[in-house]
């Protein structure tokens, strides 16, 4: 027998590199010829500069004759490795006039390139081939399309780029393992599946592609798993009461798989899909596609002229935005496209926008007592970049000690959105429109408000929920295609004028009202000749358009520009139905089940404490506690509702041997007490949460007062 058993050769060193490592992925197969007392690594033998394959495949070692191997070892013994300074350097750089020699493992250590093709050339670290890109428009990090870990999209020895797909980046180690497993017949670009161009470039950059069948082709029942489809809902919040594994064909609870990888799924209802025919991608695949530039800015849709719609109807109910009328031939095609485009989950859309956030962090110093001014100063700082990750530190104004303490980003964004909703930049009770504030316009505050709102949405802030449908339609479809309603008018006197005009029953009554309001109508340019009673409808329409839209045109344009930060406005215009749910409507009320599902247990659970926790949530929901669901969430996270993009990190529960609960808003962690009785548990929870939130409000009022 010529070859040793695998166990016998483990301690034998390669005659070229003098290492006894047995690592096929790194050094190639380790082979020992017992008869000739010879052990070699395949790559060390293959890349040696002074040896050629003169025999047949079954002769010697891989076709290299034993006598040739001994001659090469003898030649290399006279050459010193420029890395480890030891003799036996059998590999030399092929660059002209370069005299560097090294062992194969030493070359790997110094990031040399070994080309496993042609003449099997090797290049030292100074002369190795490199990948060149003409421009780098990539964000700070992109995922390796094999392992999906984020990497810096800059070509280097360890980071390679696909020659056929601009958005495909790889770790060298991931590519090498992939090549060894796939072999020459199945090694190809992970995005476009190109093999010729891809393999040629990878060989140039030193990836070894063995001439063998794929490893999975050699396994028994290799394709058995392909006979089973992935049937599980993997979205963050599954809505199916039957569970994530429930699959009911031809219903809203049918499982739809990712069209890219097929290894993630969703119920149609959980991702707001109307039918099984609609395309759906999982978050991992969508992140890769998003960064490739596949998501193009959607064109703004125009509302049809509503000349045939009665003005009275506009006063009583909200206008319903519709797409332009199309020819019958294109209508069905576009409806299919719109079904896929507009029926998207808003949390998924915000997570997509969140891919822009870089690893670099910007610390914001925020005074909770003056949240607006400190936020304005932070966002206007020339070093602030909306795409940087936000870190919050709370400070106290006029504090001689200059103390600061870590703050919760989501709490800060929640406080900022609350201030924005109640600020003088908006008017209205619940559904708000932009106001006309000349000083705010002069200070560019409308732009800053739009910018803050965009940043809040992308960085995990709460749902604003206070936009009127009119303001929303102006942003999506344009002011020229939006008809305001009476509820949009917050000025009592103007609203009374509109009501009096609209309720006039005769031409004489109508003219009488117009005469009383003559100066106002002349000032806003809405005077018109009245000949019939129906003229009142056009007059009401003109007044509404002026007061709600034209009067605030300058603030609107400024606010709109701010919303373009991080591409938020473009996303709103592309998916209006999804964003309407968070811009025009308050989030759903919290329940015991929602909070129970929201918090995960990270530490070793205490069964009794967790039972008390679930009972406490139910008691709060039933009104048997002095706290509310919102109080609990604020105590633990700083937010009164679940942000559309979700919490980062995910809220967690810890069972600690303490008497009172502890809320860590920076980590979204709630430590619940371990008590002997449920009564003691509830009393301690109520007391701590109620008094903590009360104290925070009093401190805020105290600072404002000073």
Swiss-Prot record:
A GO biological process held by the record: protein ubiquitination
Gene Ontology MF, one: ubiquitin-protein transferase activity
An annotated GO cellular component = cytoplasm
The protein's location, in the record's own words, is: Nucleus, Nucleolus; Cytoplasm
Q: Pathway involvement?
A: Protein modification; protein ubiquitination
Enumerate the residue ranges forming zinc fingers (C2HC pre-PHD-type).
11-51
Q: Could you tell me the keywords of this UniProt record?
A: Apoptosis, Cytoplasm, Developmental protein, Metal-binding, Nucleus, Repeat, Transferase, Ubl conjugation pathway, Zinc, Zinc-finger
Q: Which InterPro entries match?
A: EPHD, HECT_dom, Hect_E3_ubiquitin_ligase, PHD-type_Zinc_Finger, PHF7/G2E3_ePHD, PHF7/G2E3_PHD, Zinc_finger_PHD-type_CS, Znf_FYVE_PHD
Q: What class of enzyme is it?
A: transferase
Q: What is known of its domains?
A: Ubiquitin ligase activity is mediated by two distinct domains, PHD-type zinc fingers 2 and 3. The use of these distinct domains may allow ubiquitination of different targets by each domain. The HECT domain is catalytically inactive and does not contribute to this activity.
Instruction: State the name under which the record lists this protein.
Output: G2/M phase-specific E3 ubiquitin-protein ligase
């Amino acid at each position: 027998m010529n070859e040793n058993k695998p166990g016998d050769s483990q301690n034998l060193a390669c005659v070229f590199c003098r290492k006894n490592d047995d690592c096929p992925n790194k050094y190639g197969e380790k082979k020992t010829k017992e008869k000739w007392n010879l052990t070699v690594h395949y790559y060390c033998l293959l890349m040696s500069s002074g040896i050629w394959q003169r025999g047949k495949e079954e002769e010697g070692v891989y076709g290299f004759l034993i006598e040739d191997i001994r001659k090469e070892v003898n030649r290399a013994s006279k050459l010193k490795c420029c890395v480890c300074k030891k003799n036996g350097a059998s590999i030399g750089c092929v660059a002209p006039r370069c005299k560097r020699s090294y062992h194969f493992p030493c070359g790997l250590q110094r990031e040399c390139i070994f080309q496993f093709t042609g003449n099997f050339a090797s290049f030292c670290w100074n002369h190795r081939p490199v990948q060149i890109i003409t421009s780098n428009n990539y964000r700070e990090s992109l995922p390796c399309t094999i392992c999906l870990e984020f990497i810096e999209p800059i070509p280097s020895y360890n980071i390679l780029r696909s020659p056929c797909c601009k958005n495909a980046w790889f770790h060298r180690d991931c590519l090498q393992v992939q090549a060894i497993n796939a072999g020459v017949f199945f090694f190809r670009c992970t995005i476009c599946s190109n093999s010729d161009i891809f393999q040629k470039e990878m060989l140039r950059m030193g990836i070894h592609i063995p001439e063998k069948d794929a490893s999975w082709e050699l396994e028994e029942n290799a394709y058995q798993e392909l006979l089973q489809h992935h049937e599980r809902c993997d979205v963050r919040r599954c809505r199916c009461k039957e569970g994530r594994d429930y699959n009911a064909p031809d219903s809203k609870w049918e499982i739809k798989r990712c069209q890219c990888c097929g290894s993630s799924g969703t119920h149609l209802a959980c991702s707001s899909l109307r039918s099984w025919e609609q395309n759906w991608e999982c978050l991992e695949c969508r992140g890769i596609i998003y960064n490739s530039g596949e998501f193009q800015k959607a064109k703004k849709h125009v509302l049809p002229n509503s000349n045939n719609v009665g003005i009275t109807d506009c006063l009583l109910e909200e206008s319903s935005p519709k797409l332009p009328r199309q020819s019958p031939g294109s209508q069905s095609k576009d409806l299919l496209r719109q079904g896929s485009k507009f029926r998207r989950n808003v949390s998924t859309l915000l997570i997509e926008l969140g891919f822009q956030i870089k690893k670099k962090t910007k610390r914001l110093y925020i005074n909770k007592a003056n949240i607006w001014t400190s936020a304005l100063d932070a966002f206007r700082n020339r070093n602030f970049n909306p795409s940087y990750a936000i870190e919050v530190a709370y400070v106290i104004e006029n504090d001689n000690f200059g103390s600061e303490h870590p703050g919760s980003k989501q709490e800060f964004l929640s406080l900022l959105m609350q201030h924005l909703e109640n600020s003088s930049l908006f008017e209205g009770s619940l559904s708000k429109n932009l106001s006309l504030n000349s000083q705010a316009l002069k200070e560019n505050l409308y732009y800053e408000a739009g910018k803050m709102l965009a940043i809040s949405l992308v960085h995990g802030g709460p749902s604003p929920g206070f936009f009127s449908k009119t303001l929303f339609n102006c942003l999506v479809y344009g002011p020229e295609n939006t008809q305001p309603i009476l509820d949009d008018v917050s000025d009592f006197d103007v609203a009374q004028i509109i009501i009096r005009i609209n309720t006039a029953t005769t031409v004489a009554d109508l003219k009488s009202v117009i005469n009383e309001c003559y100066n106002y109508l002349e000032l806003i340019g809405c005077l018109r000749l009245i000949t019939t009673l129906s003229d009142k409808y056009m007059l009401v329409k003109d007044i509404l358009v002026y007061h709600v839209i034209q009067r605030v045109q300058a603030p609107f344009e400024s606010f709109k520009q701010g919303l373009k930060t991080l591409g938020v406005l473009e996303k709103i215009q592309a998916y209006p139905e999804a964003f309407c749910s968070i811009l025009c409507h308050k989030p759903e009320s919290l329940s015991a089940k929602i909070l129970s599902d929201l918090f995960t247990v990270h530490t070793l659970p205490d069964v009794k404490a967790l039972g008390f926790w679930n009972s406490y949530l139910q008691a709060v929901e039933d009104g048997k506690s002095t706290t509310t669901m919102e109080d609990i969430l604020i105590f633990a996270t700083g937010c009164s509702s679940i942000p559309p993009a979700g919490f980062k990190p995910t809220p967690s529960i810890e069972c600690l041997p303490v008497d009172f609960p502890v809320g860590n808003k920076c980590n979204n962690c709630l430590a619940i007490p371990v008590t002997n009785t449920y009564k003691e548990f509830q009393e301690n929870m109520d007391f701590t949460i109620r008094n903590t939130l009360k104290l925070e409000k009093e401190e805020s009022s105290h600072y404002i007062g000073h």
